[in-house]
Amino acid sequence: MKIADMNWAQVEAYVARDDRAVLPIGSTEQHAGLSLCVDHILSERVSVEAAEPLGVPVYPGLPYGMTPYFMAYPGTVSLTTDTYSRLIRDVLDSIATHGFKRILIVNGHGGNTSVKSTIADWTAARPGVTVKFHNWWNAPATWRAVQAVDPVASHASWMENFPWTRIAGVEYPAHQKPML
């Protein structure tokens, strides 16, 4: 279930019986002909599809991340490490304040991985709260499926090319360009 589809009383009732929540994080950056929000779209979709059958609430995904290397591409939004770390801490503070003690962060952007140290520090200061950080593509079954379709599995490759990350009206190649 999505937090967006709940009211405060439903969250209060949920936390009285379970303390799990999911927070997807992504980025807004170029992905060749795909959506600028591929990393956000994928982390949120994976989160919802995994958590919904378990009845675990999923917070709205954070659509921004750390991606300074793509700032030459129009539409990219990049946060500094300091800003992103503060954002993650503030969001975790809010989620934990309301009784969620087991929080899974599902990451969709490799550039966000450096925030793991912020999360470790935050968690160390809050006994009883556990935060796990997971890159959606690192689940063993997922990685095997990715490798079967896209052995290169790089940024904006077939690994991230799904009907829900494509832009209507954009032509896509029928084959994968070889790595240089």
Which residues make up each language-model segment?
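Extended, histidine- and acidic-residue-enriched regions that form the cofactor-binding/catalytic faces
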Residues: M1-L104, G108-L180
